[in-house]
């Protein structure tokens, strides 16, 4: 019987096709297992499917080891949370809030552009309203001390914080003191203040400003206040012209709620202020608050803003043309 021609070539062809098929199946399996197949099918190609470092989850670190870019991303996630409790859970995951729900001792040094080193700490989580109305800023910080500056060039509190020269200084020179990566990450927020100054009637005068760097108000640090009741009492004194000072206490208590860091540490009205010097690091003496002193006695005090003493004691005032410490707040 004669030999069949071509049978060897057919076998080799079949073997080659089998090898190609197996290799193709292996390639498809590898693409699917690495996520590259879906990218190819969607038209993005293999390069578009490779995860970039920015898309990977952030590692939990000691607070001072986070970069400002990382803290900005953590703050963004806190801000994007559907509610405050979810935001606190994000903060807890990254070590900013403890298991007890209180703000941890999140403090770090900040190298300023003039060579000095400031102390910075977290004082609030989802506490401030973003100025664009999109929700809450993720984190609020306190930084001290940026400078020794007067509140105004002249001795006046007319126009309050909103019209002060120190506010303008913080927006320009103050921001320039900060590291560039920090300054670029700061989110402008809305701050409530008596932006009139001295008030004689019509106490519903608190208004909003948009700020990147700002001074703390009396109520943001010390909570609900009774400073006028403490100084002047609540009952008429015989043979004197009696002034009801209760509206003034309500006014200075309405410039924003107290930040959690201060309430967590027992700061309240005229109590618990001893923790402030340790919280702020090195501060040269007293420091400004943005709250104007709203009462004028024969014109003597229409130039004053509240200040915090080096001991942490509040409720004292200083003429606005005098230099004082600049302890500022900002948000990410």
Predicted regions and their residues:
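Gram-positive cell-envelope targeting signals
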Residues: 1-55
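Collagenous Gly-X-Y triple-helix signature in extracellular proteins
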Residues: 40, 45-332
């Amino acid at each position: 019987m004669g030999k069949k021609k071509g049978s060897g070539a057919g076998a080799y062809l079949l073997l080659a096709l089998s090898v190609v098929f197996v290799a193709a199946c292996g390639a498809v399996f590898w693409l699917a297992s690495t996520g590259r197949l879906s990218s190819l099918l969607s038209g993005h190609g293999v390069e578009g499917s490779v995860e970039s470092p920015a898309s990977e989850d952030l590692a939990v670190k000691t607070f001072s080891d986070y970069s400002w870019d990382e803290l900005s991303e953590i703050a963004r996630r806190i801000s994007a949370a559907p509610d405050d409790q979810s935001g606190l859970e994000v903060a807890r995951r990254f070590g900013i809030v403890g298991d007890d729900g209180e703000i941890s001792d999140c403090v770090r040094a900040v190298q300023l552009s003039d060579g000095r080193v400031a102390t910075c700490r977290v004082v609030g989580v989802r506490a401030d309203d973003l100025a664009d109305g999109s929700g809450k800023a993720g984190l609020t910080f306190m930084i001290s001390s940026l400078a020794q500056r007067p509140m105004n060039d002249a001795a006046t509190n007319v126009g309050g914080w909103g019209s002060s020269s120190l506010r303008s200084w913080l927006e320009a020179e103050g921001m320039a003191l900060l590291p560039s990566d920090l300054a670029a990450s700061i989110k402008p927020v809305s701050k409530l203040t008596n932006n009139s100054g001295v008030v004689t009637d019509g106490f519903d005068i608190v208004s909003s400003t948009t700020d990147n760097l700002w001074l703390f108000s009396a109520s943001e640090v010390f909570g609900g206040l009774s400073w006028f009741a403490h100084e002047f009492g609540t009952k008429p004194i015989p043979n004197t012209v009696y002034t009801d000072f209760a509206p003034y206490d309500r006014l200075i208590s309405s410039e924003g709620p107290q930040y959690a860091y201060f309430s967590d540490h027992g700061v309240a009205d005229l109590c618990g202020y001893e923790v402030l010097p340790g919280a702020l690091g090195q501060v040269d003496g007293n420091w400004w608050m943005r709250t104007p002193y709203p009462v004028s006695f024969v014109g003597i005090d229409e130039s004053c803003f509240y200040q915090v003493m080096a001991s942490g004691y509040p409720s004292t005032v200083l003429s606005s043309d005098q230099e004082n410490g600049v302890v500022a707040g900002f948000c990410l």
